[in-house]
Amino acid sequence: MLKRSIMTLYSGPLDIYSHQVRIVLAEKGVTVDIHNVDANHPSEDLIELNPYATLPTLVDRDLVLFESRVIMEYLDERFPHPPLLPVYPVARSRCRLLMYRIERNFYHSMKIIEEGTPKQAETEREFLTKELIELDPVFGEKTYFMNDDFTLVDCVMAPLLWRLPHLGVHVPPRAAKSMYKYKKLIFERESFKASLSESESELREVDGI
């Protein structure tokens, strides 16, 4: 493997896990060479670097990392400012658990909507709508999601919320005022806007923001 002089990210233009990492890179202001990859037809370069040929894959000189949360935590340690995880172990662990729960519950529903039968997809749309409405008070408790500072948890939550209209999930604004306020705050953040691929920008126009 050739040593690269600049950090390289193999990213899917519509891949939600790649989007997480792109937000972190933008938040940290890291110069990175982004290679857009079709996950169904990975390049030989990616296959050589990552035996699973999964996205995202990060190359930093001799280091190759895959799995979004591994990459995000590496970037947070490699570039400590601004910090995207709390200092104290208990708070850090809570953030990690939140990321796990968002992915296990909501990302799982997204996958079924995209790949399941029409009946399965509709069930998951109803589930996501109901869960987000019930979660609305939590969105209003802190400036960001369950924290006064922007964290990796927001880097996991934001890509999902961005994709809701594309997934056919329409949460009534009156039933989720705090969530819509949170979305507006996040979607207007410079790092989030910079993280969007051209394909992601085209996913949505306006969603009551």
From Swiss-Prot:
Signal peptide: none annotated. Gene3D superfamilies: 1.20.1050.10, Glutaredoxin. One of its GO terms (cellular component) is cytoplasm. Residues 5-83 form the GST N-terminal domain. PROSITE patterns: GST_CTER (PS50405), GST_NTER (PS50404). Residues 88-203 form the GST C-terminal domain. Belongs to the GST superfamily. HSP26 family. Forms an equimolar complex with the RNA polymerase holoenzyme (RNAP) but not with the core enzyme. This is Stringent starvation protein A homolog. It comes from Coxiella burnetii (strain RSA 493 / Nine Mile phase I). The gene is sspA.
